[in-house]
């Protein structure tokens, strides 16, 4: 390679680096859309709206949420994958993302490459909730009823193939009980069905139900995790309640289209970290019985890979057929 060519490539690399830095410094220069691939009212929607408000306050630029639900979140995430990779369209999701390869034979995007994990935050236990005046006062009573007769005890979710669906199935297997699944169009709709007495229980991430719990309308029988949630010291874990089922701690996270400048992603990660360190976001997380942590992209990617394997094992032990 001639000296002239070396100088050219060096200058090109320097220019690219300078442009990337400039993008990070000027981003966001216009409103940022965050696609929530589920209906309003669920955990992802609740947490994402709070994060969007925090990012808007920090940057002085508009961050707005667009609900684009359908097909277990794939419609909304496909829209994000097809968006311009400029940092102005992001996608929000939870551990359901790791389920997608196990519930669909073919996805409308490349699950492993078309979307880049940015950061995860607000870590929430999965909780088994019943109506406040439900006849089941303990998890043991619910399990006993489930063992007594197949399909007599019902549970609702935001749809077949969602995290609560698989979490409920895994719980039933661990408990040796039979429960009938009733799918709804979104977690919020399932919660309304629970409140009206149409179903017996619901598996939900705590952000989506704590409002009703605090209002005395719903009651928690158990939470996932190896220890009790700090904000719910009176609620036992599943193991403490007699079922050897640890479950998973859920999260809310953001993804960006493949090709989004690294400098923009790094800026977004920093803004998210600043938001989660604020007293307001910490109080918000604790108020919905969650932990106010934050993961960088590397930790997030590693966890997603582990969850994908975990959900694959759960799917293999259920009667669910890939769509």
Which ranges hold each PLM region?
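Hinge/capping helix and adjacent helix->loop/strand transition within the periplasmic-binding protein
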Residues: 82-88, 102-189, 201, 238-240, ...
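A ligand-binding cleft/hinge motif common to bilobed small-molecule-binding domains
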Residues: 96-106, 170-174, 201-235, 312
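C-terminal lobe and pocket-closing loops
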Residues: 123, 209-277, 309, 321-323
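Bacterial N-terminal signal peptides that target proteins for export
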Residues: 1-12, 20
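N-terminal (or domain-start) structured segment
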Residues: 23-113, 152, 176-203, 212, ...
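An extracytoplasmic/periplasmic, membrane-proximal ligand-sensing/linker region
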Residues: 29-31, 173-174, 214, 239-240, ...
């Amino acid at each position: 390679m001639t000296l002239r060519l070396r100088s050219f490539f060096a200058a090109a690399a320097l220019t690219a680096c300078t442009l990337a830095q400039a993008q990070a410094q000027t981003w966001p220069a216009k409103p940022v859309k965050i696609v929530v691939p589920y209906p309003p009212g669920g955990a992802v929607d609740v947490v994402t709206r709070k994060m969007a408000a925090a990012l808007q306050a920090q940057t002085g630029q508009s961050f707005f949420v667009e609900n684009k639900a359908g097909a277990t979140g794939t419609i909304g995430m496909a829209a994000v994958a097809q968006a311009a990779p400029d940092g102005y369209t992001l996608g929000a999701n939870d551990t359901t993302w790791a389920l997608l390869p196990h519930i669909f034979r073919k996805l409308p995007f490349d699950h492993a490459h078309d979307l880049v994990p940015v950061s995860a935050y607000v870590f929430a236990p999965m909780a088994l909730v019943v109506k406040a005046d439900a006849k089941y006062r303990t998890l043991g009573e619910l399990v006993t009823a489930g063992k007594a007769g197949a399909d007599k005890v019902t549970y609702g979710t935001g749809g077949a193939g969602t995290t609560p669906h698989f979490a409920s199935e895994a719980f039933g297997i661990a408990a040796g009980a039979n429960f009938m699944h009733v799918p709804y169009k979104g977690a919020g709709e399932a919660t309304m069905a629970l409140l009206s007495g149409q179903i017996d229980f619901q598996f939900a991430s705590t952000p989506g139900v704590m409002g009703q719990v605090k209002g005395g309308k719903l009651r928690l029988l158990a939470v996932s995790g190896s220890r009790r949630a700090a904000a719910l010291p009176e609620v036992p874990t599943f193991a403490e309640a007699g079922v050897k089922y640890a479950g998973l701690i859920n999260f809310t996270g953001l993804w960006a289209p493949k090709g989004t400048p690294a400098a923009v992603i790094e800026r977004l990660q920093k803004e998210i970290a600043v938001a989660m360190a604020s007293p307001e976001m910490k109080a918000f997380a604790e108020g919905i019985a969650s932990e106010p942590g934050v993961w960088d992209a590397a930790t997030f990617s590693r966890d997603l890979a582990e969850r994908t394997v975990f959900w694959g094992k759960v799917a293999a032990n259920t009667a669910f057929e890939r769509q």
